[in-house]
A protein has these predicted regions:
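N-terminal beta1-alpha1-beta2 submodule of the flavodoxin-like/Rossmannoid cofactor-binding fold
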Residues: 1-109, 172-183, 187-190, 196-209
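A short small-residue
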Residues: 12-18, 122, 160-169
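Mobile beta-alpha loop/short-helix "lid" or hinge segments that flank ligand
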Residues: 49-62, 148-169
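A generic structural signal for secondary-structure junctions
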Residues: 66, 112-115, 146-150, 194
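Short, glycine-/small-residue-rich phosphate/pyrophosphate-handling segment
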Residues: 119-163, 176-181
């Protein structure tokens, strides 16, 4: 580990929100999220909060006034916990499947009901699907989070044909490659998360609408 990374790790841990983007019955997201959360905990620089969108009612109907114009808006019952946890995060990792070359509606609803909670924070992606490993969903999410003034990371973790990669108990059959990719992304999250956390403390982010 470089001296810079050692210094960053020695600082106060970054609060990392790991979001399970799918709420579909029979989804595989919790298995992937659990694996990634373990990687983040072993990294040593993060406190990890796994956010399962299945635990929060996410209406697809958006408010008449968008959150960008009314950040402190009253949100639907049951969403307060999600809003608080997103706001507290210093960095975010989205675990997403790929449905019809895109990401789930549940994830889009969670994103669109919030605005300031994403600003000036790094966002990483862990994707899983059939042949593409969620790459198409992750590329679309880059555009969405860029619009919300988040910084998306170049490095991702991808699980193509995920159903062949994990055992019945959710253990990766060959963990070395994915673990290496996760470490690269977590190192990037640590750098960006630390720098942007300091920046938000010194000069709160103000987007020009």
């Amino acid at each position: 580990m470089s001296d810079l990374m050692s210094d960053l790790v020695s600082e106060a841990p970054l609060r990392l929100a790991v979001i399970i983007g799918s709420v579909r019955e029979g989804r595989f997201g919790p298995v992937v999220a659990r694996w990634f959360a373990e990687q983040a905990q072993q990294h040593g620089a993060f406190t990890v909060d796994v956010i399962d969108l299945a635990d929060t009612p996410l209406p697809l109907e958006l408010p008449p006034v968008p959150p960008a114009l009314e950040p402190d808006m009253v949100r639907p019952d049951g969403m307060a916990g999600l809003t608080r946890r997103l706001g507290a995060a210093d960095a975010v990792v989205v675990v997403t499947p790929e449905y019809n070359r895109s990401f789930p509606a549940s994830l889009k609803a969670a994103v669109d009901w919030h605005y300031t909670q994403w600003q000036a924070k790094p966002v990483g992606f862990v994707g899983y699907s059939g042949g593409s490993g969620g790459i198409l969903a992750m590329e679309q999410l880059r555009q969405v989070f860029g619009e919300l003034h988040a910084h998306t990371l170049r490095d991702v973790v991808s699980f193509p044909r995920y159903y062949l990669l994990f055992d019945q108990d959710g253990t990766l059959k060959e963990p070395e490659g994915p673990a290496g990719a996760a470490k690269v992304m977590l190192d990037r999250l640590l750098w960006w998360g630390s720098v942007l956390r300091d920046a938000r403390r010194e000069r709160p982010f103000a987007a020009q609408l």
